[in-house]
Amino acid sequence: MPVRPALVLSLLVLTPVSAASGASDPSGVWTRGDGNARVRIAPCGGNICATNLWIGDTSGGENVGDRLVLTVSAGGEGTLVGTAYDPQRNLTYSMEMTVKARQLQTRGCVLGGLLCKSVTWSRED
């Protein structure tokens, strides 16, 4: 079962972005390191959502408009930790996001951390 952080993110959603420090704010448009996905991370309700804006190869089951709902909180210097819920697949991932000025590192895990995937993203905006 592959972990899909392209919604961010495969990767995120916990508390509002404003609850995290400005340096840890993942809001914005991000391009996945392999160039196959572009997502927007923004507040949605009381959470954060990562929404696919563009997918180059949809054979992996990812589609434009797919969304991850992230529940995250500050976990240390520039790091957010929590869960990401994928409503399209009814899956919840544990996740960690490390936010830098122009880079986002996401790590999502399932099965109690037995199956994990890390993805690097570059800020577009």
What is each residue range found by the language model?
Residues 19-29, 125:
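N-terminal helix-cap/turn-to-beta initiation motif at the start of protein domains
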Residues 26-95:
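Central antiparallel beta-sheet cores of small beta-barrel/beta-sandwich binding domains
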Residues 111-125:
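Edge beta-strand at a domain terminus
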Residues 6-16:
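Bacterial N-terminal signal peptides
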Residues 94-115:
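Short, exposed beta-strand-loop hairpins at the edges of beta-sheets
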Residues 23-25, 78, 100-102:
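A short, compositionally biased
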Residues 43-46, 98-102, 122-125:
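A short, sequence-level motif marking secondary-structure junctions
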Residues 1-5:
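Positively charged n-region of N-terminal signal peptides that target proteins for export
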